[in-house]
């Protein structure tokens, strides 16, 4: 029994000794860990990677509550340095010192080879976009823009203005739309997960109004300002001494972010790679970044034109000038914006990114500027250096004809000015007046005059005249344009209607100085005000006006220029009468002098008719190339003149129309009125009746001649139904009595 007890005590003593030894081992290990805990906690986010091979004598694998640190240290190069009182870790004492690794052959400098900040688990909980935006920009006003869609599935649009730009979000509820608008605003200038981290990164935890629109942070005491190139590091040009005050202050904040700093100096772009022969199929964004690094692209709008089809507008500011692009994706929109900047500033055209109907809807900037200059110079010439009384105008429009995109052979064929419509009391049932005297509409009527004259030229008995005509005869009958004949419309300001009212901003030299006009009923059809300026959305389902109602004082309604130009992109410029003779004629490009927004202009001119469906042969949904001008025409202050001027190539002088009466100042009918065109058409019809497909009996009335263009009329009805189906309103027509007059030779 005693032996058993003795052996039990012996084994118990051995076990006790082993336990004590194990406890002492754990205690020593714990003390050793405590000694390096300060250094571990401080250096946990930073990982030092030597550029060369070093002899590693010791390696500790430590773990904290949120991050694992693996550290390769050269013990022979470790020095000690007291840790500032503010940098003590939890549970540590002031006597603890931290170790500072040095790189051999670098003069004892602390090398920043790759600095990584890791977001710890105890960082601030991410906040939603509304809260973040409020912290960065307090006092913002969100406004309800529109509500579309059916009652059971509404779509709300909410807008917010930040730094002079307006961001619009859409959603099934106002709250989601508001959140989406805030997200888009944040994406334009915040580069961090939440607002608090953004402030810490920029060196300020108290000022919520820091401007993040600049990529190059030049604010005092900010993150990137502390890292300056050092000329002392001759052996290691890529290494820079770290400012210990910056590191300690970053540690004291207790918020560690993830960021990797580029250690190499910014390389200058290789100009040889930018030679025209070396560009090849390179992306314009990449090429522009090599010329001007650090550019930021801002998403100005994101709209859903139809289910699962979105349209984006991106803008970039280069050398004080703003360029924008639109596309089905942000990548395509950025590419267009970069391409526009390359063309305007560096005269670089990338072969793989030349604007075309299939790839881009942007016109080369230099070509657009040339068209603008041709129109303004011609107008100056016709008004004797703008000294004529008829030189005064609010809107100037013109159409330029080119062969391809060769500006050397460009020719101004029509010019016009004006901003008013006739008064209802002056409407004519004989086609003796011009109802709409807005510059764009008068330019199109002058273009009809040009087409009639070209048809007559083709029928001339002189042998050389048919070759000078822009038309060639088709085997199956009728005529079409010669190959490579293009027409370009220039308007000094954005067309009245949705293109002007709902344009997000006017491009200026600074994105932050852009102005925004409230966008309500965006995309809706709009009508002009009788004898005045401006437009209003269409009201009610009624699509026909009555003759007697207008004579008794009812307002005469005329569709806006934006909507009429949009219809030309489906029906063509030639109208119903000329469809008896020629194929539809479309604009190749539209150049706007001021108050324009390329993305919105494309949306209202082409994208609103996405649901029009299949069109008959020779008709198409035209998508003209769009562009602004480098130097917009100055705004014309004061009241608009009550006259409209027009000119057609071959004419000696301007014709002046009284915009209130729709007739010339002398009281006679204009060369652009319906009566003149009807007589011209009747003469041509008599000569061409054997050369064109027959459509029945020869019409005797103007309205019968128009209705006789059956294909044109069916496409017209198809267009109006597409507007209604899209919820954009009903096209308002003039009283039918104004077309019920006899054709005369």
Curated annotation (Swiss-Prot):
It comes from the Eukaryota. This is Double-stranded RNA-specific editase B2. GO terms for biological process: mRNA processing. GO terms for molecular function: adenosine deaminase activity; metal ion binding; RNA binding. PANTHER family: DOUBLE-STRANDED RNA-SPECIFIC EDITASE B2, EUKARYOTE SPECIFIC DSRNA BINDING PROTEIN. Its EC number is 3.5.-.-. The active site is at 440 (proton donor). Residues 1-35, 50-104 are annotated as: Disordered. Keywords: Hydrolase, Metal-binding, mRNA processing, Nucleus, Repeat, RNA-binding, Zinc. Lacks editing activity. It prevents the binding of other ADAR enzymes to targets in vitro, and decreases the efficiency of these enzymes. Capable of binding to dsRNA but also to ssRNA. Residues 414-741 form the A to I editase domain. Zn(2+) binds at residues 438, 496, 561. It comes from Mus musculus. Residues 20-34 have a biased composition (Basic residues). Brain specific. Disulfide bonds: none annotated. Gene3D superfamilies: 3.30.160.20. Residues 23-35 are annotated as: R-domain (ssRNA-binding). Residues 125-191, 283-347 form the DRBM domain. It is an enzyme of class 3 (hydrolase). It is found in: Nucleus. It holds the Pfam family dsrm. GO terms for cellular component: nucleus.
């Amino acid at each position: 029994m005693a032996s058993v007890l003795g052996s039990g005590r012996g084994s118990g003593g051995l076990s006790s000794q082993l336990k004590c030894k194990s406890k002492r081992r754990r205690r020593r290990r714990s003390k050793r860990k405590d000694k390096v805990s300060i250094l571990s906690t401080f250096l946990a986010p930073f990982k030092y990677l030597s550029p060369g091979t070093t002899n590693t004598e010791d390696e500790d694998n430590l773990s904290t509550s949120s991050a694992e640190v693996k550290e390769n240290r050269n013990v022979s190069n470790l020095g000690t340095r007291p840790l500032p009182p503010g940098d003590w870790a939890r549970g540590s004492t002031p006597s603890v010192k931290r170790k500072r690794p040095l790189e051999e052959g670098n003069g004892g400098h602390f090398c920043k080879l790759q600095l990584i900040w890791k977001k710890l688990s105890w960082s601030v909980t991410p906040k939603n976009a509304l809260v973040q935006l409020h912290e960065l920009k307090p006092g913002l006003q969100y406004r309800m823009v529109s509500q579309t869609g059916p009652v059971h599935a509404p779509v709300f649009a909410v807008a917010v203005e930040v730094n002079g730009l307006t961001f619009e979000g859409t959603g099934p509820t106002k709250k989601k739309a508001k959140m989406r608008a805030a997200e888009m605003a944040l994406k334009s200038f915040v580069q961090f997960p939440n607002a608090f981290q953004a402030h810490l990164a920029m060196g300020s935890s108290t000022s919520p109004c820091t401007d993040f629109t600049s990529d190059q942070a030049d604010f005092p005491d900010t993150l990137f300002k502390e890292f300056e190139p050092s000329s002392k590091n001759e052996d290691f040009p890529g290494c820079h001494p770290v400012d210990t005050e910056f590191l300690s202050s970053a540690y004291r904040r207790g918020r560690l972010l993830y960021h990797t700093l580029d250690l190499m100096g910014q390389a200058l772009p290789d100009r040889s790679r930018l030679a025209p022969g070396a560009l090849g199929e390179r992306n314009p964004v990449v090429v522009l970044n090599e010329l001007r690094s650090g550019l930021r692209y801002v998403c100005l709008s994101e709209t859903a034109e139809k289910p699962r089809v979105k349209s984006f507008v991106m803008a970039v500011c280069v050398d004080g000038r703003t360029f924008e692009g639109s596309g089905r994706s942000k990548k395509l929109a950025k590419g267009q914006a970069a391409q526009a900047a390359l063309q305007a500033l560096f005269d670089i055209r990338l072969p793989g990114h030349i604007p075309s109907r299939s790839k881009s809807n942007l016109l080369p900037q230099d070509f657009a500027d040339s068209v603008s200059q041709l129109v303004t110079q011609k107008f100056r010439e016709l008004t004797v250096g703008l000294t004529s009384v008829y030189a005064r105008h609010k809107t100037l429009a013109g159409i330029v004809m080119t062969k391809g995109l060769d500006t050397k052979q460009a020719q101004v064929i029509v010019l016009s000015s004006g901003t008013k419509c006739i008064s209802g009391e002056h409407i004519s049932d004989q086609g003796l007046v011009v109802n709409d005297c807005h510059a764009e509409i008068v330019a199109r009527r002058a273009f009809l005059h040009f087409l009639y004259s070209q048809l007559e030229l083709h029928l001339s008995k002189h042998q050389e005249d048919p070759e000078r005509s822009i038309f060639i005869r088709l085997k199956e009958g009728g005529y079409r344009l010669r190959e490579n004949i293009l027409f370009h419309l220039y308007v000094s300001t954005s067309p009245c209607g949705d293109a002007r009212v709902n344009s997000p901003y006017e491009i200026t030299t600074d994105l932050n100085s852009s102005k925004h006009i409230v966008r309500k009923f965006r995309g809706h059809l709009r009508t002009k005000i009788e004898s005045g300026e401006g437009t209003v959305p269409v009201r009610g389902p009624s699509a026909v006006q009555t003759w007697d109602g207008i004579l008794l004082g009812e307002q005469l309604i005329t569709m806006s220029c934006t909507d009429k130009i949009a219809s030309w992109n489906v029906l063509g410029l030639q109208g119903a009468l000329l469809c008896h003779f020629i194929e539809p004629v479309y604009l190749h490009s539209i150049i706007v002098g001021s108050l324009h927004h390329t993305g919105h202009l494309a949306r209202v001119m082409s994208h609103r008719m996405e649901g029009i469906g299949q069109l008959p042969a020779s008709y198409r949904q035209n998508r003209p190339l769009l562009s602004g001008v480098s130097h917009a025409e100055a705004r014309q202050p004061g009241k608009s003149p009550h006259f409209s001027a027009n000119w057609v190539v071959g004419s000696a002088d301007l014709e002046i129309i009284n915009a209130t009466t729709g007739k010339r100042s002398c009281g006679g009918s204009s060369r652009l009125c319906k009566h003149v065109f009807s007589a011209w058409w009747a003469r041509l019809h008599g000569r061409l009746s054997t050369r064109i497909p027959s459509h029945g009996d020869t019409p005797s009335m103007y309205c019968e001649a128009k209705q006789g263009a059956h294909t044109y009329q069916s496409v017209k009805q198809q267009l109006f139904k597409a507007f209604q189906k899209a919820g954009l309103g009903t096209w308002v027509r003039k009283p039918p009595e104004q077309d019920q007059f006899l054709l005369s030779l």
